[in-house]
Every structure is written in C-alpha cells, then in structure tokens.
C-alpha cells in the first residue's frame, strides 16, 4: 500500500514570542474566537494548554468589560 508523505514543514506558532495575552488586546483575542464569538478549541488554535487557559481567561474578562461580545448573531 502506498502511504502519503506528510510535509515536514513546521507551522508557525499562532502567538509570537513578543505578544502578550491580555484582555485589552482585542485584535489578538479575535483570532482565537469564532465568527459567533465562541472560544475556539485548542486543537483548532494550536495553542499550548497554558496559552489556551490564559486566552480563555482573557476572552472572558474582555466579555465582562464589554470589550468583546458574548454572542455575535449578526448575519
């Protein structure tokens, strides 16, 4: 049987080393949310577990402070 060859090219990390996960950085938070405003899973985001926890807390803080919507039902 013929097996497909996977590319050995490394993917870039979704968060660069200089970027800080903060609730005030809305442009960064939006990259890890769906169009509806839901938090995307770690498998889709390709974040580490620590980064995912920090991202979740930051998104929830931004929602509480009305910087980001809880739901985005605009279609």
UniProtKB/Swiss-Prot annotation:
The keyword Ligase does not apply. InterPro entries: Ribosomal_bS18, Ribosomal_bS18_CS, Ribosomal_bS18_sf. Transmembrane segments: none annotated. Pfam families: Ribosomal_S18. It is found in: Plastid, Chloroplast. Keywords: Chloroplast, Plastid, Ribonucleoprotein, Ribosomal protein, RNA-binding, rRNA-binding. One of its GO terms (molecular function) is structural constituent of ribosome. This is Small ribosomal subunit protein bS18c. The gene is rps18. GO terms for biological process: translation. It comes from Angiopteris evecta. It comes from the Eukaryota. GO terms for cellular component: chloroplast; mitochondrial small ribosomal subunit. Belongs to the bacterial ribosomal protein bS18 family. Part of the 30S ribosomal subunit.
């Amino acid at each position: 049987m013929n097996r497909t060859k996977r590319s050995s090219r490394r993917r870039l990390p979704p968060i660069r080393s200089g970027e800080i996960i903060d609730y005030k950085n809305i442009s960064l938070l939006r990259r890890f949310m769906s169009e509806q405003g839901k938090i995307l899973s770690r498998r889709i985001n390709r974040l580490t577990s620590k980064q995912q926890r920090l991202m979740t807390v930051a998104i929830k803080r931004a929602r509480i402070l009305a910087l980001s919507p809880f739901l985005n039902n605009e279609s």
